[in-house]
Amino acid sequence: MHVLGIDIGSLEYHTHLLDAADPTRSGGAIDAFANSPKGHHRLAAWLEKHGARAESTLVVLEATGVYWQGCAHHLHRLGFAVSVVNPAQIKFYAKSTLRRGKTDRMDAEVIAQYGATMRPKPWKPAEQALEAIQFLVREREAVVALLTQEKGRLHALRHRHEADEVVVRLVEERISLLEGQLEALERALKGRFAASASLQRDLELLTSVPGFGFVAAATVLAETNGFATLESGRQLAAYAGLSPAPRQSGTSGGYARISKVGNPRLRRIAYMAAVGATRSRSGLRAFYLGLKQRGKPSKVALVALARKLLCVGLAVVKSGRPYDPGYTRPAEAAPASP
């Protein structure tokens, strides 16, 4: 078996091919390729030249911005097992080996050795419709951030002594433009869901859960690839960075916070959904109030509710049954401090 480590850059990527059967894992073939369709084809030919067949080669690369996507999709289409790992995992692995120095070639070797040692799970590309939805959801998030910023500026300008009318008008026009873009993005999102019966079904199931509106449900489905690779609430909570991270050393008292090692967009939208769920007349609100009655701070209770909401959302989508309040037990779950 071979393991290919790829250090991704915006213009090119460096590769290191290891024979996983070699216990020393030293040596190996190295090269560099343009991060372009032509470069991806050259990489495939290079792998064939070195006897690295698709059925017996694991490709490992870091999730570096969007630059990894072209190479990963190309190799996946050719039948290679591709693992896309968090750069932090590679960084900590490199530290554990007391690696000195840092170059692109050295990074590719570290990634290959990580793959040979850890054997990370293969990556599964999102279906095309979900990729488009994720792109729209993230663009909407960016527009909302700009809109919030411009509304704040307009508020300040209107309270300023003798604000310039030209500046005020320009800010008002920008706000109007951004509001129009927001409406266009939401129409496009609804159109994407309407075009896919399975995604529309999942959306309706998720919005049956108190706290999940259209945008929150769309974000959760986009950021989890429709729950395709998640089998349990524990996995989902960890992926969102909402799982407990205990801290205890020697005689120091132990305490727990959420790990925050995960998808920040998913964590943020789950928290916002939890805030909405506290205003509903449901068992989820009762769950939150029960934690408050037990002395938990509001934020701790909200984090616990956010985690529970994701777990309930996963359950309704996997089961194909809408939310049933009878399955919510206010007494369950022990929250972790945020």
Model-derived regions, located:
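A detector of single, family-specific signature residues
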Residues: M1-P338
